[in-house]
Design a protein with these regions (language model features):
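Conserved "HGTGT" condensation-loop signature of ketosynthase/thiolase-family condensing enzymes
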Residues: 1-75
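Conserved catalytic cysteine-centered active-site region
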Residues: 52-104
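Residues that mark the start of a beta-strand
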Residues: 3, 104-105
Length: 109
């Protein structure tokens, strides 16, 4: 079994409903965070991108984020939706994939 480690993290600014982000699609906000994570930690293309989605916006927000951020189309990306626990659950799924040897580098949150 491989060990999984959390390298670090970033997030978007927190806004209010109908505030400064109201005209910016979620995938654009997420893509910016994704690009910054890859740059800050000098990550190569990850094996997976796993995004937590607590508001059920529909579709696969992780895939949209990855494509918007310019991540190679071959990198799988999927969304976990368990409401308030989605971010933590996406990290748990990432750890399980790394522990099993299925992946080496995953961006999750």
């Amino acid at each position: 079994m491989e060990n999984a480690y959390i390298l670090g993290g970033l997030r978007s600014y927190v806004g209010v409903v109908n505030g400064m982000y109201r005209h910016i699609p979620a995938e654009v906000l997420g893509a910016e965070v994704l690009k910054q994570v890859m740059e800050k930690y000098q990550l190569r293309e990850p094996d997976y991108i796993i995004a937590g989605n607590g508001v059920g916006a529909g579709g696969n927000i992780a895939r949209l984020m990855a494509l918007t951020a310019g991540v190679d189309i071959s990198v799988p990306a999927f969304t976990v939706d368990v409401q308030c626990g989605s971010g933590l659950e996406s990290i748990a799924v990432a750890a399980a994939k790394i522990n099993s040897g299925e992946a080496d580098v995953i961006i999750a949150g």
